[in-house]
């Protein structure tokens, strides 16, 4: 409820510091919550709209079904996908949530699903498996209800075309269309 707005305010203050010093971005990008700051910095919405959206996002995510995440290092992404799919097929929920680098993927799901995936990936030769201290299974199917409620908040927000492209977390591609940004934030 408070963490996401605090991070947004801090990140936007850093953007403002550089903007007032004359630094101009050709592109903006931010990881997960940081994408909201990137969009505000690019002119896709004003600070107040961004703050309202991230507060709503934080509230909805905090109410979502329990879950957890883990960072997997030194495992092939296709192996992670395969193991997660096998565990999902068996009835637990776990998915690759973020591919941070070619060598690091974060998985997300129920505590049972994530533990099974961690055990299987460690046995398959992952270099490191690190449980993350998080309050939910972010970027997973367990966030579906929160995402649907966030869609309504996004629909009523004044989201405009940006002055500079924003690199989307969902596609990894530059986007400037306000309508496309709205849809991509929902998908995120």
Would you name each region that the model predicts?
Residues 21-30, 47-50, 95:
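Short, flexible active-site-proximal loops enriched in glycine and acidic residues
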Residues 16-21, 39-45:
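Alpha-helix C-terminal capping segments
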Residues 2, 33, 112:
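Residue-level recognition of oxygen-bearing side chains
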Residues 1-29, 107:
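Helix-rich "cap/lid" substructures immediately adjacent to catalytic or cofactor-binding pockets
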Residues 9-16, 35, 48, 52-55:
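A broad detector of short, well-ordered amphipathic alpha-helices
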